[in-house]
Amino acid sequence: MLSYRHSFHAGNHADVLKHIVQSLILNSLQQKEKPFIYHDTHSGVGRYDLTHEWSEKTGEYKQGIARVWQQDNIPAELDSYLDAIRQLNQGETLRYYPGSPRVARAHLREQDRMVLTELHPSDYPLLEQEFHRDRQVSIYKEDGFARLKASLPPQERRGLVLIDPPYEQAKEYGDVVRAIAHSYKRWATGIYAIWYPVVNRCDIDDMLEGLQGLEIRKILQIELGVAPDTNERGMTASGMIVINPPWTLESQMQTILPFLKQAIAPATGHYKVEWVVPE
């Protein structure tokens, strides 16, 4: 199924959480001179116009990045994330929102590179156009899990793999677990960040149980919710499961999440940072 279009959801609370975690991990990789690789399994188009009719139709960004953007006393931990957004916009006007490839590109140094994968026939050409002639970027029109399997281990010992399928089908939760099982065997030194939506909590519990069964150490769960779990249709929260997280990530998110809750959903918001599997 290829019906999912992220343009409807760009800049929502789930994007904010995902891209903050992504930025913090990439910041940590910048601390050493040796090159790193960034691998994105479901890349989208790279950037999103928040004035587009699809974005305006849902208005999800208005309850996400727009609320963060207008805050005072923003934690310093968000600087590089917000810098990636500013690179696409002039002044303080918020029109364009970076997808994960653009967030990553803002963190690459000359010695680093990234691999992007997008299968959607409408999104792939836009992604290719976004990074036209960028020698540090490789783009593939194929299944994200298949490309990841073929790409590991990379020549770099360090790097980040972002796995964020649309979860249109229930089997994708199992696909994630299988992808991690294979990838970790091939590249145990990499950092893996898995994004997930909380629509049905049972799906998340099953995925976490599957990951715990892989006997991998150091698995951190980060979650931000805007409403309590419900059996009704719709996403009430989202999270990131990070394997081999930087040692600073837990404390950074403990600072950031209370700010995000207050900015985005002060009355109904909730969050957590906890170890699924400790070191």
Each model region followed by its residue ranges:
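Class I S-adenosyl-L-methionine-dependent methyltransferase catalytic core
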Residues: 1-279
